[in-house]
Swiss-Prot record:
Cofactor(s) required, per the database record: heme b
Family, as annotated: Belongs to the COX15/CtaA family. Type 2 subfamily.
Membrane topology label: Multi-pass membrane protein
GO cellular component, one term: plasma membrane
GO molecular function: metal ion binding; oxidoreductase activity, acting on NAD(P)H, heme protein as acceptor
Highest classification ranks of the organism: Bacteria, Pseudomonadati, Pseudomonadota, Alphaproteobacteria, Hyphomicrobiales
Protein encoded by which gene: ctaA
Alphabetical UniProt keywords: Cell membrane, Heme biosynthesis, Iron, Membrane, Metal-binding, Oxidoreductase, Transmembrane, Transmembrane helix
Binding positions for heme per the UniProt entry: 262, 323
Protein name in UniProt: Heme A synthase
Length: 362
């Protein structure tokens, strides 16, 4: 017998997961602002419990500032910074970490409550445990990222930044998927190719998000600020794309190569989204599916326009954050469309309590 949440528990679970998803989206934006303001290395220690409180005295502020002075970023970029200026960057990083702790508590405490009530079990329970594990891993990945900028570099390693952001968005996507699975819907009778394309859109979106994080980590948006050409042409010279050795390093550390891949993946995402929007109409997939495809394509177009504007204007903070926020919307629409087209197993279907009672009586 499949165990399903009671009607009252189901409503509470959906509200809870919606709040967590919203907080994660906010966390991603605060993290983006922390990066854009060069604030991410202002706290040089990882104290998951005792680090909850900020400095509460002038002596504590001085100690925190002196600790910051020991890392390369201060010596090479911010030498001469005042304590007042340090406080500005400190608050961004502290707020980012505090929000992470808040998300952990907002997820964990209701989760334990639902477990105690027996409201989550089976596939739903396993999925929620997996999300919890990914959240715990994210905290460690965050410090792994910060640690990369404390010894030799003046910024965090771009690959670690991209890993940190990608994991946050993977958790967000898992919650969005779970929320959609908790909502009743009719099965979509569609050709298998539509499901394949929808999942392809999710995959390409994640690749694009990872590349966007690499662009941000490398500050690659501050160079090659022309469009549609890049480095003097629509396609850069191969010698410039593969200038570093070994060749694969260019995929992660060459400004030109990473920005070019980000552009090409954006074009791929648009073409795939446009094809999907056309194909669902041609297949007569139903109004809900067609609307989902059109919303996704519209979000991709808006995101592309914001990306081009951000590049041409040399990455103003407000526009860069808007670009990052719209990326979350694209991911949300892509995940929702993939779920909309995916068949549901019996264990994943939410059954009204009356139906459960009737089934047990029979």
């Amino acid at each position: 017998m499949t165990t399903v949440p009671r009607t009252t528990d189901l409503a509470a679970i959906r509200i809870w997961l919606t709040v967590v998803a919203g907080l994660i989206a906010l966390m991603v934006l605060v993290g983006g602002a922390t990066r854009l303001t060069e604030s991410g290395l202002s706290i040089v220690e990882w104290k998951p419990v005792t680090g909850t409180l900020p400095p509460l005295s002038e002596r504590a502020w001085t100690d925190a500032f002196e600790a910051y002075k020991t890392i390369p970023q201060y010596r090479q970029m911010n030498a001469g910074m005042t304590l007042h200026e340090f406080k500005t960057i400190f608050w961004w990083e502290w707020g980012h970490r505090l929000l992470g702790r808040v998300i952990g508590m907002v997820y964990l405490l209701p989760f334990l409550w639902f477990l105690w009530r027996g409201a989550v079990s089976g596939p739903l329970g396993r999925r929620l445990w997996l999300i919890f594990g990914l959240g715990a891993l994210q905290g460690a990945v965050g410090w792994w990222m910060v640690a990369s900028g404390l010894t030799e570099r003046t910024e965090v390693a771009p690959v670690r930044l991209a890993t940190h952001l990608s994991l946050a968005l993977l958790i967000f996507a898992a919650i969005v998927w779970t929320l959609r699975r908790l909502a009743p819907r009719a099965e979509a009778e569609v050709p298998a190719r539509l499901r394949l394309t929808a999942w392809g859109l999710v995959g390409v979106t994640f690749v694009q998000l990872y590349l966007g994080a690499l662009v941000a980590g490398l500050r690659a948006g501050l160079v090659y600020n022309t469009w549609p050409d890049i480095d003097g042409g629509l396609i850069p010279k191969a010698a410039n794309l593969w200038i570093q050795s070994p060749w694969w390093i260019n995929l992660f550390e060459n400004d030109l190569t990473v920005q070019f891949m980000h552009r090409m993946t954006a074009y791929t995402l648009f073409l795939l989204g446009a094809w999907h929007a056309f194909d669902v109409m041609r297949a007569g997939a139903g109004r809900t599916v067609v609307r989902g495809a059109h919303r996704l394509l519209a979000a991709i177009l808006v995101q592309a326009g914001l990306g081009i504007a951000t590049l041409l204007m040399v990455v103003p903070i407000s526009l860069a954050l808007l670009h990052q926020g719209t990326a979350i919307i694209v991911l949300t629409f892509a995940v929702l469309q993939a779920e909309r087209l995916s068949p549901r197993r019996v264990a994943a279907v939410v059954v009204p309590q009356a139906a459960v009672a009737a089934g047990q009586a029979g």
